[in-house]
């Protein structure tokens, strides 16, 4: 039966069918890139006979990976092809590299129970060690200008991430004659020492660790190459040096590499990405071997919009020349019935910023009243930053005029009423801190923060306490306890938060129905985020309860230090991957954030911007000597290249109407700047164009399947649907009530035993080695969980593992009640810690099987439990739960 190409055009068909050897797909905006990728994966599986697990697909974001998985599995499901997603290497570079590390953990510097650092965690870890960094030789040569401690931590995080991804020679840098270079080498060396000692891993070191693992262990690399026969990379224009190395290392001599991207949409230089990867991709192969396919037929935008952004890329007004730093291309409309009406306009304010606010409002509301806009989510407002006062004031203006706005990255978290109310109530629960806050009697002065606490948070809380008698009674009781605390409480910050949720208005906030809409759910989502902030602080500072020792210090550190960093840096509000443009709201987002999206109406702001050189003398000096590739573009051209690419990306998000918007201004801060003058000045104002008959497309729903597992979802829902809503749907942080160390320790050590058996190293499964594995696991586990076992408990865990080892070694089976065969059962182990999944039309069911074993055609599924064995004759509730779990796993394995 012939392959179903769907609506693929000739360009797309060529890309889909070119499966062998290197392939470069240049995919312009709206040209069906994801459609082509999905069809290519399906073609490989169904037409070329490639197993799904032989394909690796690296995406730029987790959301893109989820969408790709959903669309691919839907296609395969319709064709009757079953896929175990966990066998496929699909995800971001970071998630794929992390999987490689996990599968071969014993060969890396990373140990079990490592802690992943996000961007804030990384900065905070550096901040906690800042005195160690400052004591390094030549540290002062890096930071010649005085900046605050938190900013220094941020700069160090940026530097080490960049240098790690470029694989610089630290030892060579230490011998350099430039003091700043030596200082940077010392910083990098200390950073690596700390992360190794504390068993930490960040986003950059995930990639370098995976690369080092494959490079230094030929056997592991050969195993990975045996698995992965085809490599595909999305958004290749935004990859960096280490990612390119990983791609070519995995692909090996087969060179079955397909990279997809658009050199005109390369936006992430500030994160270490380089456009050279996509432009120089064909140069890695002998002449003529790399095939290039250009996707240039745009199915997204109206013709006038396409012409507008085509002209933007080619009309550089003699300010610069692209030379060889882009692939020449012309995007053409794919819509057969495109409109001949005006589809690019401007929306201006001529008499100050307030006049501009009025113009934006009038533009939106007139289209709504005319019935052109059916849903506010058809409009998106794009700008360089959603954090500046001008944009935030516009958001607040529109909301005051009853136009809801969705802008989770505008850092408005601390302006939300529910956040102020919760923080105010928390502050008032600590009488010593509250008293000192009134007079700012602290060692360090942070007047803006203290003013926010007093005038906004505490005032909001006092109004609530006055209005709600039950809340007032609770507050008076906790205040009395904290004023004369004699014994430990059974709660910390998170516990107080959850006590508050018993009272109005907080109970009403979290009692909202899921699916009510982003604005209705916002309060519940923000309180959930606050629970994560509190939980993270409690973990990092080991605050499990309040006591006489910490009732004074813990609140001060939390409010004046930890929260200060978040207050100054901002907290992103909740974003739903499955709904990038929530119904009923105008979306405000950065141009970077909008990448890969499309909207019927796009308003582009930030027209006062000009190309700016971003330079860092210290890094530039290191780049010249220690990066493995010389600089690619000329330094003086980079600012123009990046500027033009940024706004090309913005303009090309529009489907039906593109609007350039600003308040016009002359003199300093001229708006629009001269770089937009030629394209802006010729545009008609929206007032001068009849838009009433324009037909807008509706926002396309994002098709992302949700994943569910037995223990994390099904079992939790069966036990308590309210807990499921709270912890899984709203994402609240669970209070740490002491880790189940014993069971985890036994489980992890048995996993070590299984790994040795699967490597055919049964001779290493000795009592001494088992004890060594258990001791190592206990060390990392106790450090990770901040919890400890007594010597007798550790010994008991060891005895459980040894008992299992003896049963497997002498053939009595897993439970010890089988016949003694005298033959080892290690060879019966087929796999351990197996991730399995089952794809359904509406969801994905996942699970992790502890052990799959069998002899001949038999297969046994084993799930280890460290608690007391249930009475099998009485069929207890525990027994029934275990039975259901194994039935689900059996279903997945089948």
Protein language model features and the residues they cover:
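Helicase P-loop NTPase motor core
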Residues: 31-34, 52, 287-291, 297-403, ...
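ATPase/helicase motor core of nucleic-acid motors
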Residues: 284-287, 342, 365, 369-504, ...
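C-terminal accessory regions
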Residues: 462-466, 583, 626-681
């Amino acid at each position: 039966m012939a392959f179903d190409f769907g609506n693929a055009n000739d360009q797309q068909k060529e890309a889909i069918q070119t499966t062998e050897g290197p392939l470069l797909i240049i995919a312009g905006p709206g040209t069906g890139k994801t459609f082509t990728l999905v069809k290519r994966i399906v073609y490989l599986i169904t037409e070329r006979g490639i197993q799904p697990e032989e394909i690796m697909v690296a995406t730029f974001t987790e959301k893109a990976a989820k969408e790709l998985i959903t669309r691919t599995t839907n296609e395969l499901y319709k064709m009757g092809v079953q896929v175990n997603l966990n066998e496929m290497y699909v995800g971001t570079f970071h998630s794929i590299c992390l999987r490689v590390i996990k599968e071969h953990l014993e060969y890396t510097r990373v140990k079990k129970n490592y802690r992943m650092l996000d961007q804030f965690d990384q900065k905070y870890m550096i901040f906690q060690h800042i005195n160690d960094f400052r004591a390094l030789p030549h540290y002062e040569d890096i930071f010649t200008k005085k900046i605050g401690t938190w900013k220094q931590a941020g700069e160090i995080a940026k530097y080490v991430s960049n240098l790690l991804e470029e694989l610089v020679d630290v030892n060579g840098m230490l011998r350099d004659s430039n003091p700043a270079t030596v200082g940077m080498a010392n910083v990098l060396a200390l950073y690596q020492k700390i992360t190794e000692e504390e068993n930490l891993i960040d986003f950059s070191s995930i990639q370098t660790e995976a690369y080092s693992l494959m490079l230094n262990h030929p056997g592991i690399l050969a195993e990975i190459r045996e698995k992965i026969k085809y490599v595909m990379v999305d958004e290749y224009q935004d990859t960096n040096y280490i990612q390119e190395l990983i791609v070519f290392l995995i692909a090996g001599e087969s060179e079955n590499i397909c990279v997809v991207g658009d050199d005109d949409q390369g936006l992430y230089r500030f994160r270490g990405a380089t456009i050279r990867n996509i432009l120089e991709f064909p140069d890695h192969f002998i002449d003529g071997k790399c095939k290039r396919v250009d996707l240039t037929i745009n199915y997204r935008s109206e013709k006038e919009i396409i012409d507008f952004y085509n002209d933007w890329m080619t009309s550089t007004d003699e300010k610069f020349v692209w030379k060889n730093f882009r692939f020449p291309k012309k995007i053409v409309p794919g819509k057969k019935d495109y409109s001949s009406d005006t589809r690019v306009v401007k929306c201006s304010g001529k008499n100050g910023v307030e006049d501009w606010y009025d113009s934006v409002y009038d533009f939106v509301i007139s289209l709504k009243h005319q019935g052109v806009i059916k849903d506010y989510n058809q409009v998106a407002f794009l700008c360089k930053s959603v954090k500046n006062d001008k944009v935030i004031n516009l958001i607040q203006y529109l909301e005051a005029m009853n136009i809801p706005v969705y802008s989770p990255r505008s850092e408005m978290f601390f302006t939300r009423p529910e956040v102020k109310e919760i923080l105010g109530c928390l502050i008032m629960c600590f009488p010593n801190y509250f008293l000192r806050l009134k007079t700012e009697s602290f060692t360090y002065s942070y007047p803006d923060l203290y003013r926010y606490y007093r005038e906004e948070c505490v005032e909001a809380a006092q109004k609530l306490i006055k209005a709600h008698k039950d809340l007032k009674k609770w507050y008076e009781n906790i205040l009395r306890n904290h004023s004369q605390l004699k014994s430990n409480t059974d709660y910390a910050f998170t516990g107080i938060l959850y006590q508050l949720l018993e009272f109005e208005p907080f109970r009403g906030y979290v009692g909202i129905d899921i699916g009510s809409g982003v604005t209705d759910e916002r309060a519940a989502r923000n309180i959930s985020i606050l629970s994560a902030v509190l939980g993270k602080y409690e973990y990092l500072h080991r605050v499990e309860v309040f006591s006489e020792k910490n009732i004074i210090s813990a609140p001060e550190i939390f409010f004046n230090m930890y929260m200060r960093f978040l207050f100054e840096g901002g907290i992103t509000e909740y974003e739903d991957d499955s709904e990038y443009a929530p119904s009923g709201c105008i979306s405000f987002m950065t141009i970077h954030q909008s990448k890969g999206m499309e909207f019927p109406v796009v308003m582009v702001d930030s027209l006062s911007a000009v190309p700016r050189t971003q330079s860092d003398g210290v890094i530039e000096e290191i780049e010249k000597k220690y990066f493995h590739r010389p600089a690619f573009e000329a330094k003086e051209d980079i600012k123009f290249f990046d500027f033009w690419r940024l706004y090309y990306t913005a303009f090309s998000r529009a489907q039906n109407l593109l609007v350039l918007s600003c308040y016009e201004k002359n003199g300093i801060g001229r708006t629009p700047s001269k770089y937009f003058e030629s394209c802006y000045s010729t545009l008609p104002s929206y007032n001068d164009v009849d838009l009433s008959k324009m037909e807008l497309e509706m926002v396309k729903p994002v098709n992302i399947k949700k994943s569910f597992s037995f223990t994390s979802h099904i079992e939790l829902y069966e036990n308590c649907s309210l807990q499921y809503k709270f912890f899984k749907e709203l994402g609240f942080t669970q209070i740490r009530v002491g880790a189940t160390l014993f069971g985890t320790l036994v489980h992890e050590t048995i996993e070590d035993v299984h790994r040795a058996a699967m490597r055919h190293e049964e001779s290493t499964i000795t009592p001494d080695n088992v004890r060594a594995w258990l001791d190592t696991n206990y060390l990392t586990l106790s450090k990770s969980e901040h919890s400890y076992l007594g010597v007798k408990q550790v010994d008991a865990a060891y005895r459980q593992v040894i008992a299992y080892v003896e049963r497997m070694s002498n053939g009595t089976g897993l439970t010890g009640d089988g016949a003694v065969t005298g033959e080892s059962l290690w060879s019966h182990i087929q796999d351990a810690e197996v991730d399995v999944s089952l794809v359904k039309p509406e969801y994905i069911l996942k699970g992790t099987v502890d052990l799959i074993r069998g002899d001949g055609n038999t297969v046994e599924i084993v799930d280890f439990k460290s608690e007391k064995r249930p009475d099998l004759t009485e069929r207890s509730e525990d027994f029934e739960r275990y039975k259901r779990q194994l039935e689900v796993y059996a279903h997945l394995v089948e």
